[in-house]
UniProtKB/Swiss-Prot annotation:
It is found in: Membrane. It is a single-pass membrane protein. The chain crosses the membrane at residues 7-29. Keywords: Membrane, Transmembrane, Transmembrane helix. Its main location: membrane. This is Uncharacterized protein AF_0101. One of its GO terms (cellular component) is membrane.
Length: 216
């Protein structure tokens, strides 16, 4: 009986140490989730005296909080398309409108509706799914208003990272956990970008790309 108890204690200690070691490895495995909404221009001569009216970043129907600008003004505006964001800036190089990052919470890119609002057209162009990954490409059109000096291209971009979480198991072994597509844990991203090249009210066209990498 004593020998049996000793063996049980040894097994318990091995499992406990293995579990704790596995828990420590999660710092190298788990990934933070994030989303960032921004406008950029890469032209040598950046657009000057810029006024933009662009969609909001929507989180399951709610408008994400917008960040104040260091130089310029940003505000919500009622339009014929609903609430939109108005930006007034002397120059546009890179302006972050909304940003979020979390090490605690993952984002289910498929089921959590983090997108731009309004989107007037969204057409699926391609979908590829296999054991390793899922990828989808959409053509999108959004209403925008733009006034600026010069001939420039302004990009409106939403970038979402799902993050990834695993559970500890034993030494270097972990259990992939969330987010999930069906029963499959994954890490993935969404990248939605439209291009503004004209002035005045217009339908700006771009692409939304979604890619999930399955962790099984």
């Amino acid at each position: 009986m004593r020998r049996k108890n000793v063996i049980l204690v040894i097994f318990f200690l091995i499992f406990f140490i293995g579990f704790e070691f596995s828990d420590m490895t999660l710092a190298f495995i788990n990934l933070p989730s994030s989303y960032t909404y921004y406008v950029t221009s890469f032209d040598k001569k950046l657009p000057k005296n810029v006024t933009l009216i662009i969609p909001t970043c929507s989180l399951n129907g709610d408008i994400a909080e917008i960040k104040p600008l260091r130089e310029g003004n940003i505000s919500l505006l009622d339009t014929q398309y609903g609430k939109m964001i108005k930006i007034e800036a002397e120059e546009v190089g890179h302006i972050t409108i909304t940003s979020f990052i979390s090490s605690e919470k993952t984002i289910d890119i498929i089921n959590e509706n983090i997108t731009l609002s309004p989107i007037l057209e969204r057409e699926l162009l391609s979908k590829t799914e296999n054991k390793k990954e899922l990828s989808m490409v959409y053509r999108v059109k959004i209403p925008v208003y733009a006034e600026f000096e010069g001939n420039s291209t302004i990009y409106v971009t939403l970038h979402v990272e799902s993050g990834f979480k695993a559970l500890p198991f034993f030494f270097t072994f972990t259990i992939p956990w969330e987010p999930r597509y069906g029963w499959k844990p994954y890490a993935g991203h969404k990248y939605l970008e439209v291009k503004i090249t004209k002035k005045g009210w217009q339908l700006a066209e771009g692409e939304e790309r979604v890619r999930l990498i399955f962790a099984v």
